[in-house]
């Protein structure tokens, strides 16, 4: 049986509850929901990248990528991405940012789901991902 490996890149704070930012078991890597927090600074609380959807989306994608890389994966290994938005009016803008970000990706993820949710104050987007390596 393959062990589960918890993934927390140096750029991330320790989660506030009993979970990890990502978990790899065998060739499967699950990235927990990430938000647009800037890289962690010792002794400082998590800080959003900025007030705009663009700033937060790009930082959120960078945070997801950091966990993928920590687990030995890349965007090319991602099978599914879930995007959580706080406002349906952000859908078109998020799609434009998303398409620009993934423009050079050889094979796009097989699926993407967009869900509208409530997030902590000031946060506009959350993204999680499932990758299969190999």
Region locations from a protein language model:
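N-terminal presequence-like segments and the immediate start of the first folded domain
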Residues: 1-62, 66-71, 76-79, 85-134
């Amino acid at each position: 049986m393959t062990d589960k490996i918890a993934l927390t890149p140096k750029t991330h704070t320790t989660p506030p509850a009993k979970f990890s930012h990502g978990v790899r078991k065998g060739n499967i890597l699950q990235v927990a929901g990430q938000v647009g927090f800037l890289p962690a600074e010792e002794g400082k609380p998590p800080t959003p990248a900025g007030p705009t959807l663009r700033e937060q989306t790009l930082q959120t994608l960078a945070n997801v990528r950091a966990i993928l890389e920590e687990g030995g994966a890349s965007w090319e290994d991602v099978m599914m991405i879930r995007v959580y938005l706080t406002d349906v009016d952000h859908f078109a803008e998020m799609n434009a940012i998303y398409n620009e970000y993934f423009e050079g990706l050889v094979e796009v993820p097989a699926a993407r789901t967009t869900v509208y949710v409530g997030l902590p104050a000031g946060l506009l987007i959350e993204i999680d991902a499932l990758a299969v390596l190999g």
